[in-house]
Curated annotation (Swiss-Prot):
A minor in vivo processed fragment (IVP) also exists, probably as a result of proteolysis. Probably O-glycosylated. Contains equimolar amounts of galactosamine, galactose, glucose and mannose. InterPro entries: KMP11. Pfam families: KMP11. The keyword RNA-binding does not apply. Monomer. The modification Omega-N-methylarginine is found at R45. This is Kinetoplastid membrane protein 11. One of its GO terms (biological process) is positive regulation of cell population proliferation. May be involved in the regulation of the cytoskeleton through interaction with the subpellicular microtubules. May be involved in parasite mobility and attachment to the surface of the host cell. Strongly stimulates T-cell proliferation and is thought to play a role in the immunology of leishmaniasis.
Amino acid sequence: MATTYEEFSAKLDRLDQEFNRKMQEQNAKFFADKPDESTLSPEMREHYEKFERMIKEHTEKFNKKMHEHSEHFKQKFAELLEQQKAAQYPSK
């Protein structure tokens, strides 16, 4: 069964969205376990804030990198389709 570029692209987009959603769910679960800020010392509050920022930054970077990989795969797939088309229908 041949896969079209649109099908391939849509599948990668769905996977990117699903991955992003799962990362957000994991982060939400993690942040939900944070103790009440009123019970934290200023040092621990600062520690939690830095850690939350770091997790959010890493999540954003990772999601961006996954999206970049997907775009690269889409480009390569389009190139392969063009090569296949050229091989099947060589110009005279």
